[in-house]
Each structure stands twice: as C-alpha cells, then as structure tokens.
A protein has these predicted regions:
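Short, Lys/Arg-enriched anionic-surface-contact patches
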Residues: 1-14
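Residue-level detector of intrinsically disordered/flexible regions characterized by low predicted structural confidence
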Residues: 6-9, 41, 65
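Major-groove DNA-recognition helix of helix-turn-helix-type DNA-binding domains
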Residues: 32-61, 68, 74
Length: 77
C-alpha cells in the first residue's frame, strides 16, 4: 500500500489574531497595548527577572497573558 500525502492547510503564525497569540514581538505589543517600543524595551531592561518576556536569540518576545497580569498590578509604567 502506497503512502498518500495528505494536504493540510498550514496556518501561519501571522494569521493568528494578536489577542490569541501566546507571544508578541515588541512591535506587535507596542501596537496592541499602545505603549511605545522604547518604553517596552526599558521595562524589559529594568525588570530582568520578570517572567512576562522571553528571549529567542536576540529577539524579545512578550508573553501576552503574563504581561497583561503585570500591567493589571502596575500603577505606572
């Protein structure tokens, strides 16, 4: 019996709505939260032990739900 190829439509990560993604790039997070890219980078630099971001090589990825919890408890950013 020959193996048959099954065509599966792959969803690209960019096709997933921002509010459903696990991580966001700095640019995506800036647009979504209306916080400047510089301010987001400063938050990451001043909070190196927080768990609302992770590094993928030299790229910063914001963990959306954890960052929202961080913002819920913040009085100022």
């Amino acid at each position: 019996m020959a193996n048959k190829k099954i065509n599966v439509d792959e969803k690209r990560y960019s096709d997933i709505p921002v509010w459903r993604r696990y991580t966001l790039t700095i640019e995506e997070a800036a647009g979504y939260y209306h916080i400047g890219e510089g301010k987001l980078r400063m938050l990451i630099d001043t909070h190196p032990n927080e768990d609302f971001y992770m590094m993928n090589g030299n790229r910063v990825l914001i963990k959306r739900e954890k960052f929202e919890r961080y913002l819920d408890h913040a009085t100022a950013i």
